[in-house]
Amino acid sequence: IIYERIKEELRAGKGLSLAIKDGFSNAYSAIIDGQLTTIITGIVLFIFGNGPVQGFATTLIIGILTSLFCAIFITRMLLEWVEAKWGTVAFSRSWSENWLANVSFDFIGKRKVSYIVSSALVVLSLISLATLGLNTGVDFTGGRTYVVRFDQNVSAEDIRAALDGKLVSDDATKSSVEVKQYGAENQMRIITQYKYDDTSEETTAEVDALIYEALKGFYSYPITLDGFISTQEDVNGIISSEKIGPAIAKDMIYSALYAVLFSLIAIGLYITIRFKRWEWATGATLALAHNAFLVIGIFSMLYHIMPFNLEVNQAFIAAILTIIGYSINDTVVIFDRIREYITLYPKRIIGDNINKAIASTLSRTMNTSGTTIVTLLAIFILGGETLRGFIFALLLGVIIGTYSSVFIATPIAYDILRRTDKKTK
């Protein structure tokens, strides 16, 4: 944001020293608003999340605060030092100097197209959720989950058939076993509700032993029970396991719903206070709900066919709240520029001010989204199997959030503003 603002000041004909000074000054409002709204989602995550999610929320908040400090103080100090010592600082290459600097597009005039596209995606998501549902993890359903590694490639169907013969209960729903490949072909993820309402150590040991008896024949070399249940990641057998009772699962569902709801309310209130018009908050909040719902809908559409696990669990809720934080950051930058243009050009019609404001922030929007996507793709490709579903949700969120900031949040706010202003007149 700061660098793009400095580039704008340079294009306006200001000297380097003044451009740096004004670039920082004019970027403060957007930076602080954007980061505070993301911190709000981090606080909500910490309040409603469990241990690992709380750790993620803490890291997120600390990261935002340190980035904010470094951007505002350290970066400025270094830029001013370089400018004073060498008299020049390059903020772009010749080929990128005016990239997206002179965009002329009627974003507001084309808003009906974006409404149709988003409505179609929402309808598809609703159909998918009604017919296919979601791949809910044990966080929300309750149950036992295991990741088991074999010393040779195995078939998920063969593993499931073997387990069905051992994990037998009077309640058929608690006897069902779900088996999916987890990463390599010699790793399987096993989910069962067999005796999941009894989380005692004795029952856990009993279930572990039954799974061992069912699966020991799939190893080319003999494996002992102790070796099988060791939960060491670098050996064969169970490399991770988790058990969640029905009461805890129910609490997690409510916590997830409260987390998303309260984050939307808190962000909506903050936008209302900062921009002094509820219309902006309504546009932003509806766009955030749109983003979260589309990510959920796409997970519903794709979990049957993707080669990696798309599970809706606590980590997924953390991803949704992170998406909300990222999307509102992008939206606030655009809203802040619209507010600035309305102040500078009060006689210009609001539609023109909005179009100019979006066009002037487009370079920053694309650069930020592009660098974020590159980083997420690197983690998605090189990271472990456990991260892929989480990172995939973030990738979807960045793409959808960038689109909605420009084509959903701002147009909705514009339409509501027009109607309320007409009623006032």
Model regions and ranges:
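A structural signal for conserved, well-ordered secondary-structure elements
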Residues: 1-425
